[in-house]
A protein has these predicted regions:
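Short, structurally constrained coil/turn elements
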Residues: 31-32, 46, 67, 82
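Residue-level signal for well-ordered alpha-helical positions
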Residues: 21, 41, 65-68, 77
C-alpha cells in the first residue's frame, strides 16, 4: 500500500475559492482505479492550512493519478489561488493493524 501525507497552505481569505476547487479534484480522484482514500482536511487551529492524506494500492496507480486531466487542472488552479508551503511525502506501508 502507498501512503501519501503532507500539507499545503492557501491564504485564509482565498479558502472559499480553494474549497470549491478542492471538492472537484477530490471527487474525481476518489473514482480512480487504485484510490483507497483521498482526503484534504482544514486545520482547525491554523486557518488556510490543508492536511493531505491518501492511500493507493500501488505506486503505478499513484503515478497514473498524477497524469490525469483533473490533476493538471488542479495544478494550475492551485497556483492561481496562491498555494504555498507545499510539503508532500510518499511512503510504502506494510500490513496495518487496528489500534
Amino acid at each position: 500500500m502507498i501512503v501519501v501525507v503532507g500539507q499545503f497552505r492557501f491564504a485564509p481569505e482565498r479558502m472559499d475559492e480553494a474549497r470549491a476547487v478542492m471538492r472537484k479534484v477530490i471527487a474525481a480522484t476518489r473514482s480512480e482505479d487504485g484510490c483507497i482514500q483521498y482526503n484534504y482536511g482544514e486545520d482547525v487551529l491554523d486557518p488556510g492550512l490543508i492536511r493531505v492524506s491518501e492511500l493507493w494500492h500501488s505506486r503505478a496507480q499513484l503515478h497514473a493519478h498524477m497524469q490525469t486531466p483533473h490533476m493538471a487542472t488542479w495544478q494550475s488552479e492551485r497556483v492561481a489561488l496562491g498555494l504555498s508551503e507545499r510539503s508532500i511525502a510518499v511512503y510504502e506501508a506494510g500490513d496495518g493493524t487496528a489500534l
